[in-house]
A protein has these predicted regions:
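PLP-dependent class I/II
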Residues: 1-215
């Protein structure tokens, strides 16, 4: 499971995550929790599976909240019985992360105020999309609770999200992602917007979409 999620920005509530963890424990299922977008939330903080189950596998990264995309650095929290097997597996892929990446990661823990300011910027851009996208005909979506994506139902506009996104790119220069990249069954009716770029770029993109939809 992923919380906050990509592409929806949905955050799994603590009681729901606890129920999932209990179900997995009862059924002998290994729970893997992708928590890469932890720290980027707009309401309550996202719960971690590590607090709910000693048997869960938690995957996280410095790429999102810590803005270290490209440094290829992350971590796992695993049950004791998996430590040795995972270490053996990892040693077949790499020896260790670069020292430079590790030193940078240590330094970034002292940058919380700046990082939280970046999250506040995401919130501002999210709120702009929530206000302005309906003016461009994108009015069927749930407000993202975390991450920096908005997943919109465009079934009122198209039944082919790939062709729809290609047309928008060709005619407006705005790049959005077709839902089929995330959901092969229902993705033709959805698109994903990202608001990880600057406020000026997001605002300009929305203006183009509004103008594009005008009769």
């Amino acid at each position: 499971m992923t919380s906050p999620g990509n592409p929806s920005g949905t955050v799994i509530a603590p009681h729901e995550m606890a129920a999932l963890a209990a179900y997995c424990r009862d059924k002998g299922i290994r729970l893997i929790s992708d928590e890469i977008y932890h720290g980027i939330t707009y309401e309550a903080a996202a719960a971690t599976a590590a607090a709910l189950s000693d048997e869960a596998i938690v995957i996280n990264s410095f790429s999102k909240y810590f803005t270290m995309t490209g440094w290829r650095l992350g971590w796992m929290v695993v049950p004791e019985d998996l430590v040795a097997p995972i270490c053996r597996l990892i040693q077949n892929f790499y020896i260790s992360p670069p020292t430079l990446s590790q030193d940078a990661a240590l330094a970034v823990f002292d940058c919380r105020a700046e990082l939280d300011g970046i999250v506040a910027g995401y919130r501002e851009r999210r709120d702009l999309l929530l206000r302005e996208l309906p003016k461009a005909g994108f009015n069927k979506f749930a407000a993202p609770q975390g991450a920096f994506y908005l997943y919109a139902d465009v079934s009122n506009l198209t039944n082919d999200s790939v062709a729809f996104c290609e047309r928008i790119l060709d005619e407006t220069g705005v790049a959005i992602v077709p839902g089929v990249d995330f959901d092969r069954e229902r993705g033709q009716a959805y698109v994903r917007f990202s608001f990880s770029t600057s406020l000026e770029v997001v605002a300009g993109a929305v203006r183009r979409l509004i103008d594009w939809q005008k009769p």
